[in-house]
Amino acid sequence: MKFEQSHVLKELPKQFFASLVQKVNRKLAEGHDVINLGQGNPDQPTPEHIVEEMKRAVADPENHKYSSFRGSYRLKSAAAAFYKREYGIDLDPETEVAVLFGGKAGLVELPQCLLNPGDTILVPDPGYPDYWSGVTLAKAKMEMMPLVKDRAFLPDYSSITAEIREQAKLMYLNYPNNPTGAVATSEFFEDTVRFAAENGICVVHDFAYGAVGFDGCKPLSFLQTEGAKDIGIEIYTLSKTYNMAGWRVGFAVGNASVIEAINLYQDHMFVSLFRATQEAAAEALLADQTCVAEQNARYESRRNAWITACREIGWDVTAPAGSFFAWLPVPEGYTSEQFSDLLLEKANVAVAAGNGFGEYGEGYVRVGLLTSEERLKEAAYRIGKLNLFTQKSIDKTL
């Protein structure tokens, strides 16, 4: 007997990356050397001191029992200490920090924590596709905020109609941005706080790439903005900062009423994370951060190598200011999907088509800087052999 899925599951958006993975796997099965720049999976190992702490914690029988429903105090206090050290923000570990099963879980569950069916969420376009999943599961409505190059990929609040402002209850933001690589300014975050306060909107800032900023500029935490804690939260994941993507650990910080809503939801959905994972995560946050600085320098060097190689083949591209993604325009005459398919079929280079991140992603592809400089240069060389760009002198200033 086959049982039918619920209406909510049937309405979930198609997982865009599933089709990309299938295409890449097909090429690999055919024996091709594919340079996969299409996904956002960190390629470096978790730092050794974090792994060693995990080993120690796993060996402790106490950690194999049920852990506290709302997360260990050690991890929550470590998150608060991390925010104080890195951003100068004071947080109460018990009321302003919630432990998450990775950043994605928090982002997807938040609409169910705060919204009722039919409520409206403001969502960046292009943006992280799993935001859409959270909207669907909450039976909410989605209003897109276009992110365009002319506005440095920051939303224009003045273009949001009075009707939508009245209806909106929640807003997602994400800087450094996936997929564009843009960063937010303090002025933009100040405008965001004003806009949200005036309209009663809760801001959810996805700070997944908070540790990845270039050219000497450290990305800003939204909570550094005066009044931000009154109208929103920030979600931080250890996946990117410490190469812990498979560990599934993160946390939300900020407005106490939102943190309580997250905790209440998770009380009914889960028992908290494996305590050994929480111990290792606390170690990551509290220990020396040299590994983070070294990794950021590695990503910046890769960015420079990739952008230079692209410009040498005539591709007129802009260097990202943050994240480990580059957002690149497709050549004239191609859609995003046509161009990405061409690169995979003819050059054995996988990139993510921009339309997978929303309507305003059309005309771009996203490249992940998640392989060696040599492989990035090789990818650009292969693309150059397709003669898709006019060879010309381009300003090499990054």
Curated annotation (Swiss-Prot):
It is an enzyme of class 2 (transferase). Disruption phenotype: Disruption mutant grows more slowly than the wild type strain on methylthioribose (MTR) as the sulfur source. GO terms for biological process: L-methionine salvage from methylthioadenosine. One of its GO terms (molecular function) is pyridoxal phosphate binding. Keywords: Amino-acid biosynthesis, Aminotransferase, Methionine biosynthesis, Pyridoxal phosphate, Transferase. It catalyses: 4-methylsulfanyl-2-oxobutanoate + L-glutamine = 2-oxoglutaramate + L-methionine. Pathway: Amino-acid biosynthesis; L-methionine biosynthesis via salvage pathway; L-methionine from S-methyl-5-thio-alpha-D-ribose 1-phosphate: step 6/6. It comes from the Bacteria. Its cofactor is pyridoxal 5'-phosphate. The modification N6-(pyridoxal phosphate)lysine is found at residue 240. Belongs to the class-I pyridoxal-phosphate-dependent aminotransferase family. MtnE subfamily. Involved in the methylthioribose (MTR) recycling pathway. Catalyzes the formation of methionine from 2-keto-4-methylthiobutyrate (KMTB). PANTHER family: AMINO ACID AMINOTRANSFERASE, L-GLUTAMINE--4-(METHYLSULFANYL)-2-OXOBUTANOATE AMINOTRANSFERASE. This is L-glutamine--4-(methylsulfanyl)-2-oxobutanoate aminotransferase. It comes from Bacillus subtilis (strain 168).
